């Protein structure tokens, strides 16, 4: 941001600005009824907000690279851990404010270590990319999907009751079974938790989904479980 605007932002200011730009991106997409890149939304916001007092011309490829590194996981090109957790925090705040449902799904690719050990890391990378591509192709524009690390991923479904997650997970599983083939066949397990049923803080919500995921793994894998209080 400093490179573009010659203005130093604190971490809290930068986060607030990022949220405003993301909101502008969503508004532009709704108005135009098509995808609008984050870069376009950022420039539109900067210009309309008069943040560009002394704008600097920089190489567009450098700008895109910096933007990508701050937001996305390089291998899978979904949101990175920091950004998907930030989105979860903001979506949970919005759900509380407007009294909406919020569902999260914590994914883990089954037997991923064995895939890496037996078939090699290149195949492991292909599995991660295939999985993320299928998920991205089957979620809504308002949903957010990111990689927490390794073979673990988080899906945030705003304004969505838990029951609506199951048809989506079934569709993802069916598509993967159809296209992965015998040489690269793999499955996933998931843990599901929701607001307001299970938690009203992001850490507790994640912990609830993680418990449900562990239960799915222990009871045979390749299945989806909702968190329940014992």
Model-derived regions: residue spans:
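Conserved nucleotide-binding and Mg2+-coordinating catalytic segments in signaling enzymes
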Residues: 68-86, 107-120, 129
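Catalytic/regulatory signature loops of cyclic-dinucleotide turnover enzymes
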Residues: 208-230
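Active-site-proximal structural segments of metal-dependent nucleotidyl cyclase/transferase enzymes
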Residues: 87-119, 135, 146
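GGDEF/GGEEF active-site signature
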Residues: 130-201, 213-215, 226
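A short glycine-centered flexible hinge/capping loop motif at secondary-structure junctions
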Residues: 116-124, 149-150, 220-222
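Regulatory sensory/coupling modules that transmit signals to nucleotide-handling catalytic cores
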Residues: 1-65, 230
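Signal-transducing coiled-coil linker helices
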Residues: 38-75, 82-94, 143-144, 156
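Heptad-repeat coiled-coil signal-transmission/dimerization helices
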Residues: 84, 88-89, 105, 127-128, ...
